[in-house]
Amino acid sequence: MTPPVKRARHRAAAQRLTVAMAYWSSAVSGTGTAHAAGTHGVPHNSGSDFILPIGVVVVVCALAAYAYLKRKRRTHSRTTPGGSGAHPEPVPPATPFDVLDDEARAALVATDEAVRTSAEELDFARAESDAKAVGPFTGALTHARSELATAFRLRQELDEGRPEDESARRGVLAEMTARCDGAGRCLDAEADAFDRLRALDQDPARAIAAAEAAFRELTTRTGAAERTLTGLLRQYAPSASAPVAGFIEEAKDRLVLATTSLNAARQALDAGDRANAAAQVRVAEGAVHQAGVLADAVERRGRALAEAAELLPPLLTACDDRLADHQAELDADSGRHERIARARSVLAGVREESGAGPHDPLDASRRVLETAGADAGDAAAPRGRALLDSAVLAARAAIDAADAHIATHGGAVGCRARTRLAAARAHLAQLPDTGSDAPGALSSARAADALAREALDHAEQDVAAYRTPGLAGGAGDGGPVTALAGGIVLESPATDGSRRPGGPPGFGGPATRARRHPSNGPRARRAP
């Protein structure tokens, strides 16, 4: 509302303006009369000739001043809270935080998938070209990975409740999305040059032959991995191989998909459809790559279990020795004494299990570290080194299992599993020097293990939820379900409730990775 004093000033100004206008109106009238008389022989003063133009100028200025005062008063009334007869311009509401959060999560998933599939196809390009030719693409991928790692770190901090202020959290989401956009643009910028390097559309026959050779090699490796898994099931408790228990069957599904796609690529090539042949060979490459990831994960699990079994006795001995060294001070502290008694009970139970038959050495190591590790002493000491070695081994095994699951189910796994995996890797990569901070190194290794196991849990839940509605043909037919859940082909939007496979992903960011489209691709419908 305009204050009374200002309203009075505006009225006074308007009154003065009215008087001035009346005065100059009469002056102009008089001048005109005198001028008329002068033309009829009455002498006139030449200075009177200036009165008319000056009067006009003054009147115009007065009108402009009045209009300005009126406009200023109207604007003030409109923008002042409570101003009468006017309403403020509507301000668009801020985007809800949950919407921004969902968008940032989606950007992380899309960027992570783009980085993964770019790395996959870059490996095929390395096999076909020299290091100099793939140099620019390696650099782009390295930059994208760096941006993505920062985005995942920000996501992990948000998930941990940092920062607490919503405005600051919005800023973190904005930076996270910007990092993902930057990573994607970096890969997108190299997509055309990468296609020229591989020249799949010009010469798909060469890539088909290479994929067929890789397929034959993977068939042999999958058979060997199956024998490894059979041995693990016989030698250890079921929990020891549980993270990779289904990997052999999934690897076989990928090989079935590769066979189908290679046949389709050959047929397209014979028909002169090189674009379709190139798209089909990319599907085959993706399937072969994932079969290799699954088979390798089984072999790595076997090696990790064997190493954990070797480390378990020295780990138990290190804990026993350390507890004995501090027996005197433990007896003086009843609360600490109770904790140590529980730790000794765990050690005895682990020894009994390991000598009674099939057991899980990785799980046994974790139990020892969780219950006895806090009181077992300095990991920098020679006998305490077994603590850190066991913790690092457990973390690496958990990271391997989670990464293999995410890498082979990219179409189903969401943001949370990927974020925890990235956090686990960061903890393991930044282990403090054991000479200066041995307890910190042990703590980081155990944190990495916990985060990786959480990542695997989330990934398994995501895959189960993805498959819950059901797809015609089942989950293990090497067809549309395998291709979609694995991210070997991208999902194409459909209006009839179906999941329609689109093209295979390739090197590039979210804007370019879906540039290939095989014709007559299979269609997966939701089960009724």
Regions found by a protein language model. Give the residues of each.
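Long, charged/polar, soluble alpha-helical segments
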Residues: 1-528
